Amino acid sequence: MNWRLVEFLYLLFIWDHILVQPSHQDPAATNQHVSKEFDWLISDRGPFHHSRSYLSFVERHRQGFTTRYKIYREFARWKVRNTAIERRDLLHNPLPLMPEFQRSIRLLGRRPTTQQFIDTIIKKYGTHILISATLGGEEALTMYMDKSRLDRKSGNATQSVEALHQLASSYFVDRDGTMRRLHEIQISTGAIKVTETRTGPLGCNSYDNLDSVSSVLLQSTESKLHLQGLQIIFPQYLQEKFVQSALSYIMCNGEGEYICRNSQCGCQCAEEFPQCNCPITDIQIMEYTLANMAKTWTEAYKDLENSDEFKSFMKRLPSNHFLTIASIHQHWGNDWDLQNRYKLLQSSLEAQRQKIQRTARKLFGLSVRCRHNPNHQLPRERTIQEWLTRVQSLLYCNENGFWGTFLESQRSCVCHGGTSLCQRPIPCIIGGNNSCAMCSLANISLCGSCNKGYKLYRGRCEPQNVDSERSEQFISFETDLDFQDLELKYLLQKMDSRLYVHTTFISNEIRLDTFFDPRWRKRMSLTLKSNKNRMDFIHMVIGISMRICQMRNSSLDPMFFVYVNPFSGSHSEGWNMPFGEYGYPRWEKIRLQNSQCYNWTLLLGNRWKTFFETVHIYLRSRTRLPSLLRNETGQGPVDLSDPSKRQFYIKISDVQVYGYSLRFNADLLRSAVQQVNQSYTQGGQFYSSSSVMLLLLDIRDRINRLAPPVAPGKPQLDLFSCMLKHRLKLTNSEIIRVNHALDLYNTEILKQSDQMTAKLC
């Protein structure tokens, strides 16, 4: 055995076994690389790239076995050292190199190029030489596992992996029993692959001839291989060039020279290899890895949908009525099992996101010097809103083997594949502000019963209408004078007597058919005094007309401000007519034939007609006066003989309000209001007098509907409260109680939203 040991020590560095071979790999093996923690082996650059264990790992990883578990033991026989390399005096004691290796060195010459070094030395003998190692034998059990299959088979991959570890740890105690059990698991699940390895002399086994047993190099944490660069056996003038050539071969794949400048190292590519700085293979592998990670991300969502927790959640959702996003969200938050499963999904996706980000950063870092621009988009996590929409789609767009996406705004499905067969019958909506109480058992899309205050009609709930004849007993909203707008305009032009409302003209500043100076504000009122004289009527205004006469060559242009009191009261309880705003009409000015008089007409029509008790008209003038006359007052007696002042005078010969009166039964309405007020004060149930409540709600709505226009976003004026105050003589507290009772009935019983109003009286 001694002569074999001596021969090994002197020839170790020139044998194929001791020189680490360059990484030549066939194309079929290139696609079998793995990344992540094995990046140092990527791109054919690892010293053990052709080792049997690494190739086996690559093959198993390609098949989906991502986890490797190995248990082994070694039997060291010899510690060997390369004593020839330890010599320091290489000139006087030259190394016993093989003639072929010496001939290769001589062929290099004094100034070899990088390509000569690669072709002559590196491709044949490698880049490193073995200094010391351990020879002996090794036996090992290697097990490759696919955790995804273990998860599907057992339901808990962590416990399964731990059980396999415990089983494999008994390999050296009961080899036959352990292997038999592992092979059974391998055949039944297909989730593991088991390999036994036994090389070299093992233990104290009896061998007929120990020299006939080939020892192997042991490679473990206890038995390390010590390597050194091959340049130590070259002459000094070749050592630096060899190191540069080796780096160019390893880092640039022999397609350029590896150069470091200003702490920045890179490949200077040859003309025939302009992309030598671009690791195409690495980039393709990482892009493939990112694509697989994106698939894993999508599969994580499918795993949640296929989980028992999610299926149980879907079964518990009510199916007898329509589920909105808000109601599904409430059920989602109340399911604790689903919440725990969803948290596991979020944690796994967070870990997956970090892996994707790390790989993407490496990908973009590798492609800095490439013409190839990687195109990668990080997967986006599905939000809670998207999960709730997904639940809706599973409920209502999963029929006849087709799938689709549900649109709640349209209450319909968008089926995938261009068909319309995926939509199931959409249940009716109940609860909340909806009128339906229960869906129909015969057809779930239609309503089966309605809430109080509604009636069922053809599968829909409609508000219970108040009897029009009974409503007319309180206020006669419908009269014979409800003409169309064109008819009203024609009648106003003809000054039809049917539209006259006989009002009382009151003014301390103006006399009809008398000239006056309008340069200061003038006030006049047209009132009915219905609280005293016409108690059984309320009045509607549909137009106003004034006849204004001016002096010849007058430059005055009157301007009116009109305030309306709907049911009497003080001036502060009136509202101003917004001429030309929010669609409100303007004054129309028509000159009378052969006269200096004009008819000023305001036509409200059916759209802007409203209640009135008193109309206040404020008159000012827009006039173009000389600067000397602007400071003169318009007060004092009218002097028609003065030509300089006469041109400013005007007179109003006629003022008329057009409209009609509605019969008003104050006593009957007061009794209905007092009934509601008493019920509210005693805390009674509102639905006990639902007919009265519906009647008053209808009257309030029809009265407030005639309120004047307001700016967008602002509430309408409350005319109903003004009527209660001035025509029924209710106190403020009684008015508040009545309105509150009506609001409660509207929201609690009828499930309708209240319309905000602004206080006027």
UniProtKB/Swiss-Prot annotation:
InterPro entries: BRINP (IPR033237), MACPF (IPR020864). GO terms for cellular component: cytoplasm; dendrite; neuronal cell body. One of its GO terms (biological process) is central nervous system neuron differentiation. Keywords: Cell cycle, Cytoplasm, Glycoprotein, Growth arrest, Neurogenesis, Signal. Residues 1-22 form the signal peptide. Glycans are attached at N156, N433, N443, N553, N599, N631, N677. It is found in: Cytoplasm. Pfam families: BRINP (PF19052), EGF_BRNP1-3 (PF25415), MACPF (PF01823). Residues 68-251 form the MACPF domain. Plays a role in neurogenesis and brain development. May suppress cell cycle progression in postmitotic neurons by inhibiting G1/S transition. Belongs to the BRINP family. This is BMP/retinoic acid-inducible neural-specific protein 1.
